[in-house]
């Protein structure tokens, strides 16, 4: 990788005094020291310390006090100590064994410092770190590019490009298909339908309803968009950070405990959850698979093949109240809206389709071909992952350029489907959709009969009431459950939909127990292409194999994903690898372009004890309780994950991996596949909504989104969420179901 055009950052402010800055310089220089063959500059020469100092005067100002306190604990004599003594102090800081402050603060500070240091080493130089691109050059990352040719994705291909000039990268003012200015509702007046949530689900439902002649008001808690989410910059990364879409979430961070005996503590997701117009549709990874036929009759199919005793006694596993055949025409409609690329029949286990995909799949990368060949030798049936990413022009959108910035970014050519480039602009054209952004819904209003008739919301101008003939709750799983529980009335003392205590129960979230594989001496070029440009196997998904004697039911998908950006990648280390010093420096320098991830999507069974409720001890800035997550995986999931990791290890070994390591089975209580909490079902005693999203105990109220899921199959949920939303929208509009 050659040096690119200079990115001269603006003069950087500073927050630290001279002594603290000297301490910081010495500390980060020891964490990422100069050395190696060929020699790598240290953290100070690479601009990492200057980056941190400037960030503490700006976006990270809230951390300044913690830096000052912990730098004092490290001690002013640190810069003059011999390297061995400096190393001993760093080790004690990391382990929380310095004399002061308390251990947890020390460990948390080291984690924070390590994250900020990695940003300073590998961010775009426009932010003041990665001086002269030296961080990128050290690991072989070409920086921001508009796209790559197929031959550059071949195994061992040399990619020798300078980073694109900053002035030539996409900016909001020059980006295509931005939605028209939001028609902000300034004086609420009754509407036929009020939709809570302006994400993918809300936008798709609004589009369907306005086309049927309905007057719709959509309330979105987050800000509108101006295109900044499409900037190719890992530090700004998620459009969440770039547009302030995390502001609402930061005000109401959920708490988590594994079981009811523990004390719940605030927990942040490892991936951004975005509150902004269009929701996560702008930053999603765009994998777009349908569920399998037996996913909808999961309990009866399992019992028929293995007996009821095979189902874990603690699991609340149940069949869905609809079949694949009921949803198939809406899968067709959702794929048509998005523009899904794929190869019908390539996955031998897929459910029947009425037609081929709209366009061919994303091209196969060198890594994908290596995975497919090895998986085939192991007896599996690899296939290209269907994706809501165009491989040919489609309705004014452009084909994928295979840049490095897809998942967690907006698409600079609109190849990746989003609410903005599929339904929002068209829905707003006729004036029947009225939009309010920055509107935090406080509660759903019911009348004396118990029917939903409106919502109370708060915006910058104060508190308002918006009435409507039908209310559609289409927020994320957490907010769907939270609003139902907060909306209490004379006939709903426990909250809406909660007459039988079902709201919040059966919560499920995807675990991500990947297997990492290093191929020493090879160039994988995983920084090229979208995440969804993947080869996958479904042989071990659902009930596609005999489970007798295995000690678990159901399965999981294994896939070789692309998109590997350096700030994130620098934090992925094998067990026993230190997070600092020459060993970390040399490992990451050599392994960045040699490391693959075999991503595992295990099926997570529902348990009534895994639930969402209101935390009595934690509140948001308005004084309202936040969501408390009670979640753990069961023995079934632990055995399943171990089985899938063994299979992934065999595939990686067949691919020629020289080093392998695994994530733990429990990767957290929040992912981007968070479902359940307002389960659908025909029996009002055991479910919150019916198969169309209608709330059993609250006429006029519909709940849509992943929160209505009965189970969490080994498939990305978005396509099914949208198909269910389209089906519900037809019902609300008075149309007969499609067949």
Each model region followed by its residue ranges:
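Glycine-rich loop(s) and the adjacent beta-strand/alpha-helix scaffold that form part
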Residues: 211, 215-217, 221-236, 430, ...
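FAD cofactor-binding and catalytic pocket of flavoenzymes
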Residues: 259-261, 265-273, 277-284, 288-304, ...
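Mature-region segments of soluble proteins
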Residues: 6-10, 18-26, 30-177
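N-terminal Rossmann-like FAD-binding beta1-loop-alpha1 element of flavoenzymes
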Residues: 191-218
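N-terminal FAD cofactor-binding segment of flavoenzymes
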Residues: 221-295, 323-333, 372-376
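Conserved redox-cofactor binding core of oxidoreductases
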Residues: 242-243, 250, 260, 264, ...
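Extreme N-terminal leader/targeting segments of oxidoreductases
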Residues: 134, 146, 153, 160-193, ...
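A glycine-rich dinucleotide-binding beta-alpha-beta segment and adjacent secondary-structure elements
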Residues: 384-390, 399-406, 442-445, 593-604, ...
């Amino acid at each position: 990788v050659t040096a690119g055009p200079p990115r001269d950052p603006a003069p950087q402010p500073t927050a630290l005094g001279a002594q603290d800055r000297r301490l910081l310089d010495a500390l980060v220089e020891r964490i990422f020291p100069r050395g190696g063959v060929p020699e790598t500059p240290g953290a100070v020469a690479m601009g990492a310390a200057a980056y941190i100092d400037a960030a503490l005067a700006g976006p990270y100002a809230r951390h300044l006090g913690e830096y000052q306190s912990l730098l004092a604990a490290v001690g002013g004599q640190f810069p003059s100590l011999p390297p061995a003594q400096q190393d001993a102090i760093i080790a004690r800081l990391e382990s929380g064994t310095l004399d002061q402050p308390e251990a947890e603060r020390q460990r948390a500070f080291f984690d924070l410092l390590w994250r900020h240091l990695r940003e300073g080493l590998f961010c775009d130089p426009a932010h003041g770190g990665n001086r002269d691109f030296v961080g990128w050059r050290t690991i072989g990352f070409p920086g921001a590019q508009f796209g790559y040719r197929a031959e550059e994705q071949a195994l061992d291909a040399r990619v020798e490009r300078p980073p694109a000039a900053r002035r030539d990268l996409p900016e909001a003012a020059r980006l295509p298909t931005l939605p028209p200015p939001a028609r902000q509702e300034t004086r609420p007046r009754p509407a036929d339908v009020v939709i809570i949530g302006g994400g993918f689900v809300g936008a798709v439902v609004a589009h369907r309803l306005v086309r049927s002649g309905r007057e719709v008001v959509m309330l979105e808690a987050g800000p509108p968009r101006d295109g900044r989410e499409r900037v190719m910059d890992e530090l700004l990364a998620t459009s969440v950070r770039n547009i302030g879409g995390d502001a609402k979430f930061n005000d109401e961070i959920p708490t988590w405990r594994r079981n009811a005996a523990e004390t719940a503590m605030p927990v942040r997701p490892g991936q951004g959850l975005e509150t902004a117009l269009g929701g996560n549709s702008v930053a999603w990874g765009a994998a777009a698979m349908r569920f399998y036929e037996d996913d909808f009759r999961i309990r009866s199919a399992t019992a028929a093949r293995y007996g009821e005793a095979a189902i874990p006694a603690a699991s609340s596993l149940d069949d869905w109240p609809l079949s694949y055949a009921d949803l198939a025409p809406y899968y067709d409609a959702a794929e048509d809206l998005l523009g899904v690329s794929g190869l019908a029949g390539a996955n031998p286990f897929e459910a029947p389709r009425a037609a081929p995909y709209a366009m061919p799949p994303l091209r196969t990368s060198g890594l994908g071909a290596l995975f497919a060949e090895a998986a085939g030798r192991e007896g599996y049936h690899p296939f290209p992952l269907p994706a809501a990413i165009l491989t040919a022009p489609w309705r004014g959108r452009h084909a994928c350029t295979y840049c490095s910035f897809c998942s967690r970014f907006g698409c600079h050519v609109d190849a990746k489907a989003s609410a903005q480039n599929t339904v929002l602009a068209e829905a707003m054209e006729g004036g029947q959709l009225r939009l309010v952004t920055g509107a935090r819904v406080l509660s759903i209003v019911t009348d004396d009969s118990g029917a939903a008739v409106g919502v109370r919301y708060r915006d910058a101008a104060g508190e308002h009431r918006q009435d409507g003939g039908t209310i559609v709750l289409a927020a994320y799983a957490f907010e769907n459950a939270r609003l139902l529980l907060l909306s209490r009335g004379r006939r709903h003392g426990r909250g809406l939909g909660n007459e039988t205590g079902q709201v919040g129960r059966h919560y499920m979230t995807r675990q991500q127990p990947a297997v990492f594989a290093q191929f020493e001496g090879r160039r994988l070029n995983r920084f090229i292409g979208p995440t969804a440009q993947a080869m996958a196997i479904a042989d071990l998904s659902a009930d596609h194999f005999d489970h007798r004697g295995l000690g678990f039911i159901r399965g999981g998908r294994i896939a070789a994903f692309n998109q590997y950006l350096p700030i994130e990648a620098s934090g992925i280390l094998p067990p026993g690898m230190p997070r600092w010093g020459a060993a970390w420096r040399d490992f990451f320098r050599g392994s960045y372009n040699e490391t693959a991830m075999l991503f595992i999507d295990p099926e997570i069974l529902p348990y009534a004890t895994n639930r969402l409720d209101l935390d009595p001890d934690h509140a948001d800035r308005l004084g309202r309780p936040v969501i408390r997550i009670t979640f753990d995986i069961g023995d079934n999931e632990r055995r399943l994950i171990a089985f899938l990791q063994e299979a992934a290890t065999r595939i990686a070994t067949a691919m020629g991996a020289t080093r392998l390591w695994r994530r733990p089975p429990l990767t957290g209580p929040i992912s981007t596949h968070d479902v359940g909490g307002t389960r659908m079902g025909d029996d009002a005693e055991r479910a919150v909504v019916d198969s169309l999203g209608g709330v059993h105990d609250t006429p006029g109220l519909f709940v849509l989104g992943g929160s209505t899921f009965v189970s969490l199959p080994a498939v990305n949920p978005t396509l099914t969420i949208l198909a269910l939303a389209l089906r519900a929208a037809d019902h609300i509009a008075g149309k007969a179901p499609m067949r």
